[in-house]
Amino acid sequence: MFEFITDEDERGQVGIGTLIVFIAMVLVAAIAAGVLINTAGYLQSKGSATGEEASAQVSNRINIVSAYGNVNNEKVDYVNLTVRQAAGADNINLTKSTIQWIGPDRATTLTYSSNSPSSLGENFTTESIKGSSADVLVDQSDRIKVIMYASGVSSNLGAGDEVQLTVTTQYGSKTTYWAQVPESLKDKNAVTL
């Protein structure tokens, strides 16, 4: 049943070189497995972060409830937007938002300023209508008035003029509103835009 090999030339031997090659192969396989596991973890976390950012851009928007303009000498000198959170949105800090103004004679980007409306220039300011903060939308019931000084941006808006306003929140979500001045401003103090 068992065969005894007595001749030295016919016995199989494992040399030290073969043992070293085997250990090296095991080490290389272990290192490769570690690299694959680390790469998979990195890709998973990167994909998760990208998904969260995309979700924030879609859901953390504002809604423009209404818009009106103050009329002075048959021209609109202030454009006022009433804004609120969109459904499912987190807190939206309007001080970190921008408004792209594309008007009849000029296009620019407005940033937040706490200055009084008459000294805004290429900025906008906010006032609380309903809620505890004048510049952060916390609840769906909060309402904030966004004030832009038209003559600080370009010239006052005349009858029939149109301005495209795109509000970009700190999350990168955008809301666009077209403010259309009525054809007649005679004997008016304020108009719906």
Swiss-Prot record:
GO terms for biological process: archaeal or bacterial-type flagellum-dependent cell motility. The keyword Hydrolase does not apply. It comes from Halobacterium salinarum (strain ATCC 700922 / JCM 11081 / NRC-1). GO terms for cellular component: archaeal-type flagellum. It holds the Pfam family Arch_flagellin. Its main location: other. Flagellin is the subunit protein which polymerizes to form the filaments of archaeal flagella. Glycosylated. Residues 1-12 form a propeptide. Belongs to the archaeal flagellin family. One of its GO terms (molecular function) is structural molecule activity. It is found in: Archaeal flagellum. This is Flagellin B1. InterPro entries: Flagellin/pilin_N_arc, Flagellin_arc. Keywords: Archaeal flagellum, Glycoprotein.
